[in-house]
């Protein structure tokens, strides 16, 4: 399946909540879900009671859309989480949070995960001083993530830093926007997930 390239605001309306896929627009009164909170389409205003399977599927789709991941890779992360010690659902969320594009977003080096993915792909991001252009790269404790010197002076990055100047990163990350860099000070835990998610539904979906 190809990556979704349509209007991302439709995805938020489909899930019935903000997924913060549009960056700065999501924080303004132009946000589509604030104006039309029902799903898109001819029958969008109808609200049928979902089945158990439907609830599991919706939760899976929601988290996939938040992180911008396709099914094959999403399932691979789940398989990794199952093999790790501890609670599968919590392991799964921790893996998703450790993706480089997500970390760039969490640090405030981008205004959305999609923008962070583009920054990584175009070689603007360094990990421990070396360019990493793989959005799915999983960071480890102690890693330093920074914006390349030649890139941080660009108009777009200056706009990003200004927009995120008051941002407080999750406790597993530290950031210095003046230096355009941050550090992974710990591994993310369930407490660090700041969006509503019932990960047990995803576990149940893949355990059917």
From Swiss-Prot:
GO biological process per UniProt: ribosomal small subunit biogenesis; translation
Protein name as catalogued: Small ribosomal subunit protein uS4
GO molecular function annotation: rRNA binding; structural constituent of ribosome
Function summary: One of the primary rRNA binding proteins, it binds directly to 16S rRNA where it nucleates assembly of the body of the 30S subunit.
UniProt similarity note: Belongs to the universal ribosomal protein uS4 family.
Subunit structure of this chain's protein: Part of the 30S ribosomal subunit. Contacts protein S5. The interaction surface between S4 and S5 is involved in control of translational fidelity.
Pfam families, per database record: Ribosomal_S4 (PF00163), S4 (PF01479)
Keywords assigned by UniProt, alphabetized: Ribonucleoprotein, Ribosomal protein, RNA-binding, rRNA-binding
GO cellular component, one term: small ribosomal subunit
Transmembrane annotation, as ranges: none
Entry-linked NCBIfam families: PRK05327.1, rpsD_bact
Designated gene of the protein: rpsD
Domain S4 RNA-binding: 98-161
């Amino acid at each position: 399946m190809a990556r979704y390239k349509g209007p991302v605001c439709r995805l938020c309306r489909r899930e019935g909540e903000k997924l913060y896929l549009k960056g700065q627009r999501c924080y303004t009164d132009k946000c589509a879900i604030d104006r039309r909170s029902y799903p898109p389409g001819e029958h969008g205003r109808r609200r049928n009671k979902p089945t158990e399977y439907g609830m599991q599927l919706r939760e899976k789709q929601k988290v996939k859309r938040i992180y911008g991941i396709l099914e094959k890779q999403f399932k691979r992360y789940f398989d990794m989480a199952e093999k790790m010690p501890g609670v599968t659902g919590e392991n799964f969320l921790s893996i998703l949070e450790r993706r480089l594009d997500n970390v760039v977003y969490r640090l405030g080096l981008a205004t959305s995960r999609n923008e962070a993915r583009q920054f990584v792909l175009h070689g603007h991001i360094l990990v421990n001083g070396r360019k990493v252009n793989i959005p799915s790269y999983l960071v480890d404790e102690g890693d330093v993530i920074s914006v390349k010197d030649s890139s941080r002076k660009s108009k777009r990055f200056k706009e990003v830093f200004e927009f995120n100047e008051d941002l407080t990163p999750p406790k597993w990350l530290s950031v210095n926007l003046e230096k355009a860099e941050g550090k992974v000070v710990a591994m993310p835990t369930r407490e660090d997930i700041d969006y509503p998610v019932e990960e047990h539904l995803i576990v149940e979906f893949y355990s059917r």
